[in-house]
């Protein structure tokens, strides 16, 4: 895996969770965060100079917290709104990560987020972000651009 890809993915994720989800990433993943169970996954596909998919999984009770923070609500919103919020997080992370990888002149088309299905390919980059008592796992898959996938 490329260190640059992981760095750009981590940077985009931490900024998005801070700015959009009002969550402060922890510098290290502790045991509780590491053992937190996956509660939801979404993915976004992208096409441009290279194509691929970003998968975002949240673990440890983060889904209702993220949605409530984004919507400015005290109580957890409906499951549908929780998944919409996570989809928006994935979309923003992807949109912020791609220029860091490819440069600001390249144009990408990012699809609407969807509930994630299993992916049989190995990711070209994978990072974990500690958030409160849980964590987010971010996996980047790339196709149609062999040089990037081999970095």
What are these regions, as identified by a protein language model?
Residues 1-151:
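N-terminal auxiliary interaction/assembly segments of multi-subunit proteins
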